[in-house]
């Protein structure tokens, strides 16, 4: 089909004669198959925002409506839609107006009407291509009297033809066999008349073959498609193919060497256009909705203020730091302009693939028609390739952009050579995690048989097939040719909702699900290794033993006074800390494995200041919360409790209170409600002035701090004193 990047004028010429509606039981009629092909083609054009203009002409209709119609000429031919941009109305016309009739019309007459429509409606417009697509089963009679004249006018006007038939045609212009097309889906199989082709259809094939050979030569038969072949090619929505814009710049190495270059985006992450708008639910019009923004003070009267009386503020902990427009402009990075400067070189082995980041990949070429630049860049590319080196580059798109640091590595192909640029992370972009070693746990040490089984499984799941004889590597799962299922699902649902307002959305199309399945060849190869792994790694249910609680545990003697008991607990913790510190060696910072013990050790031994150690602990708390897992929530709680205890002991109450207030705001922003419920249940609140002299928080304020913001604040009553053992026995 004509889905070229150039603007095209396309006429869909559809046979709706009586024979197009005939079908055998269990088969779709030719007209239904033709409607499917046209629908898929038009919906591609709609969602790709194509500038092509499309018209719709039906022949074999009960009525007549075209500019050439006379008393006995060009009858039963209807121009259903003139040339215009495709839209959902055209899709509705294809679905509703294309129905089989009781008449027939001359195919060549319909072709003349289409040619006339293109010539008249393209006057004053620029089109790269003019195209007619014919959908027919060739059952309608036709007169070949003017065939040579039609072919001559098609060539003269630069109009190309494509035919879409219910059955395939081979390279010799003969009807194909049932086995000619290998279809993976039953509903895409070619439709063959069970009693063979009629004489009229055979005559039509000869006429179509003659026309296409006259227009396109031997390649003309490639423009004759079967409905099933077209459906397979069109079953995936495609976005418009955008031509990469050149980015000219100077590649500089030191102060004295510069090379004129031009860069193109090779890979860029495709994103949805933000086209969602709010409309009135009854009229479905955007204009019926008015949006008004009002700024109010956070007081009882909600006093309204004008936008001119407001400025931006940056929230830092519990404080808001004001920033005016002047401040924002002064804060912005002032760049000298676009830049592609080499900072230095390093071995390619030092730049690991896991460091690649960003949303695009650039290919850097020498400037066009600059021989000196081409020689210089080629020398650089080959030198890097021979030495296994890469260039570390400072990249800035323009003077408004913040600079990036990236890697440029050589890329040499038979047809061209260039540098490929990928962004690298800064220090803040890296996430460091520490995990306990599996090697130190003897229970986790695999046997040789288990290691061998996993090796075999990995080998069997390889998505690369190597042909040893031809030394060719074949990709069994080419991701660059697999459409994004998110886009496909959105387009499918938008199309369905536009045409069927009241119906439920359809399920995901099966061919999309099939594309995401592992290759059949790979699944067959990994069956045996999988069964071997299942045998060598048996899964057994672990039943957690309940801790038996004795009467002594319940009614334990507690003759110690409060302060003494607290002192005993502290000494016990210190013993534990010293033992763990001996196991870990010299502790110089708070780690992620034992953050509580590390924190206590650092502040008590005065290896680090309380401020420094607390900042390290807070960093780990934030990392634990980012995982959004209950296990790490509990670990965060242990850290917070330790922070609170040590803050009281070292008179750092205000530091802990500021942290907890900032934590609550962060929890609300990230919607970590489950974690905050744990905080409330454990009663971890602000440090009051009764607990530490450095705090100004009252007990009432500390209690209100844990109360939900959306609920009315209620006065809290003090906890009742716990009863003694005798009271408990009386209750029993």
From Swiss-Prot:
Localization: Nucleus; Nucleus, Nucleolus; Chromosome
Induction of the gene: Up-regulation during myogenesis is inhibited by cAMP, 3-aminobenzamide and sodium butyrate. Expression in myoblasts is unaffected by X-rays and UV light.
Compositional bias per record (Acidic residues), positions renumbered to this chain: 717-732
Residues recorded as bearing Phosphoserine in the entry: 258, 318, 578, 580-581
Disordered: annotated span: 708-732
Molecular function in Gene Ontology: 5'-deoxyribose-5-phosphate lyase activity; ATP binding; ATP hydrolysis activity; damaged DNA binding; DNA end binding; DNA helicase activity; double-stranded telomeric DNA binding; protein-containing complex binding
GO CC, any one term: protein-DNA complex
Domain VWFA intervals: 9-161
Ranges for domain Ku: 253-453
One GO term of the biological process aspect: double-strand break repair via nonhomologous end joining
Keywords: Acetylation, Activator, ADP-ribosylation, ATP-binding, Chromosome, DNA damage, DNA recombination, DNA repair, DNA-binding, Helicase, Hydrolase, Immunity, Innate immunity, Isopeptide bond, Nucleotide-binding, Nucleus, Phosphoprotein, Ribosome biogenesis, Transcription, Transcription regulation, Ubl conjugation
Sequence positions bearing N6-acetyllysine: 265, 332, 666
Region span, Leucine-zipper: 138-165
Modified residues annotated as Phosphothreonine in this record: 535, 716
Post-translational modification: ADP-ribosylated by PARP3. Phosphorylated on serine residues. Phosphorylation by PRKDC may enhance helicase activity.
Positions of crosslink type Glycyl lysine isopeptide (Lys-Gly) (interchain with G-Cter in SUMO2): 195, 532, 534, 567, 569, 670, 689
Domain notes: The EEXXXDDL motif is required for the interaction with catalytic subunit PRKDC and its recruitment to sites of DNA damage. The VWFA domain interacts with the KBM (Ku-binding motif) found in a number of DNA repair proteins.
Record note on quaternary structure: Heterodimer composed of XRCC5/Ku80 and XRCC6/Ku70. Component of the core long-range non-homologous end joining (NHEJ) complex (also named DNA-PK complex) composed of PRKDC, LIG4, XRCC4, XRCC6/Ku70, XRCC5/Ku86 and NHEJ1/XLF. Additional component of the NHEJ complex includes PAXX. Following autophosphorylation, PRKDC dissociates from DNA, leading to formation of the short-range NHEJ complex, composed of LIG4, XRCC4, XRCC6/Ku70, XRCC5/Ku86 and NHEJ1/XLF.
Family: Belongs to the ku80 family.
Name used for this protein in its record: X-ray repair cross-complementing protein 5
């Amino acid at each position: 089909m004509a889905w070229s990047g150039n603007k095209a004028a396309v006429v869909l010429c559809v046979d709706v004669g009586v024979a197009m509606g005939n079908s055998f039981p269990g088969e779709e009629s030719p007209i239904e198959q033709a409607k499917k092909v046209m629908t898929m083609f038009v919906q591609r054009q709609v969602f790709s925002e194509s500038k092509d203009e499309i018209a719709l002409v039906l022949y074999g209709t009960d009525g007549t409506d075209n500019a050439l119609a006379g008393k006995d000429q060009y009858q039963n031919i209807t121009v259903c839609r003139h040339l215009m941009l495709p839209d959902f109305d055209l899709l509705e016309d294809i679905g509703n107006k294309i129905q089989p009739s009781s008449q027939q019309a001359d195919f060549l007459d319909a072709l003349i009407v289409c040619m006339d429509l293109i010539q008249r409606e393209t006057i004053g417009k620029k089109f790269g291509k003019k195209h007619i697509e014919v959908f027919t089963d060739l059952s309608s009679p036709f007169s070949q009297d003017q065939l040579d004249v039609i072919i001559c006018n098609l060539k003269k006007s630069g109009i190309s033809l494509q035919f879409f038939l219910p059955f395939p045609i081979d390279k010799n212009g003969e009807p194909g066999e049932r086995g000619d097309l290998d279809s993976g889906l039953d509903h895409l199989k070619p439709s063959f008349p069970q009693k063979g082709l009629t004489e009229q259809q055979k005559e039509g094939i000869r006429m179509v073959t003659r026309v296409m050979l006259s227009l396109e030569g031997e390649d003309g038969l490639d423009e004759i498609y079967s409905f099933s072949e077209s459906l397979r090619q069109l079953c995936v929505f495609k976005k418009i193919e955008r031509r990469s814009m050149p980015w000219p710049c100077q590649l500089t190495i030191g102060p004295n060497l510069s090379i004129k270059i031009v860069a193109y985006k090779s890979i860029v992450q495709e994103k949805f256009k933000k086209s969602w708008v709010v409309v009135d639910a009854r009229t479905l019009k955007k204009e019926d909705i008015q949006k008004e923004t009002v700024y109010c003070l956070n007081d009882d009267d909600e006093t309204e203020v004008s936008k001119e009386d407001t400025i931006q503020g940056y929230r830092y902990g519990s404080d808001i730091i004001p920033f005016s427009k002047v401040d924002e402009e002064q804060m912005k990075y002032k760049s000298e302009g676009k830049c592609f400067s080499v900072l230095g070189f390093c071995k390619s082995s030092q730049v690991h693939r896991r460091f690649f980041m960003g949303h695009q990949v650039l290919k850097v070429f020498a400037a066009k028609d600059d021989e000196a630049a081409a020689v210089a860049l080629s020398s650089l590319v080959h030198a890097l390739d021979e030495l296994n080196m890469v260039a570390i580059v400072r990249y800035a798109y323009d003077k408004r952009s913040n600079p990036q640091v990236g890697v440029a590595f050589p890329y040499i192909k038979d047809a061209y050579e260039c540098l490929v640029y990928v962004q690298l992370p800064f220090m803040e972009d890296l996430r460091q995690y520490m995990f306990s070693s599996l090697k130190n746990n003897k229970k986790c040490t695999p046997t040789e048989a288990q290691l061998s089984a996993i090796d075999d499984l990995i080998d069997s799941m390889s998505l690369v097939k190597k042909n040893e004889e031809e030394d060719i590597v074949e990709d069994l799962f080419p991701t660059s040719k697999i459409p994004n299922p998110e886009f496909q699902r959105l387009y499918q649902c938008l199309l369905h909702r536009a045409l069927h307002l009241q119906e439920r959305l359809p399920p995901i199309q099966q061919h999309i699900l099939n594309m995401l399945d592992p290759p059949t060849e790979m699944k067959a190869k990994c069956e045996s290794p999988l069964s071997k792994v299942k045998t060598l790694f048996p899964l057994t249910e672990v039943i957690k033993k309940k801790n038996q609680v004795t009467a002594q545990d319940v009614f334990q003697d507690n003759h110690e006074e409060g302060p003494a008991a607290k002192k005993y607990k502290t000494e016990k913790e210190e013993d534990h800390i010293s033992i763990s510190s001996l196991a870990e060696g010299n502790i110089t910072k708070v780690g992620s494995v034992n953050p509580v013990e590390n924190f206590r050790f650092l502040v008590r031994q005065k290896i680090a200041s309380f401020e420094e150690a607390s900042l390290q602990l807070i960093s780990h708390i934030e990392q634990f919360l980012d995982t959004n897992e209950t296990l790490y929530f509990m670990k965060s709680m242990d850290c917070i409790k330790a922070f609170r205890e040590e803050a009281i002991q070292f008179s750092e109450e205000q530091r802990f209170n500021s942290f907890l207030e900032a934590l609550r705001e962060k929890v609300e922003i990230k919607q970590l409600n489950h974690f905050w419920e744990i905080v409330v249940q454990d009663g971890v609140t602000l440090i009051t002035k009764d607990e530490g002299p450095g705090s100004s928080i009252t007990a009432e304020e500390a209690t209100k701090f844990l109360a939900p913001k959306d609920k009315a604040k209620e006065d809290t009553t003090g906890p009742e004193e716990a009863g003694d053992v005798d009271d408990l026995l009386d209750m029993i």
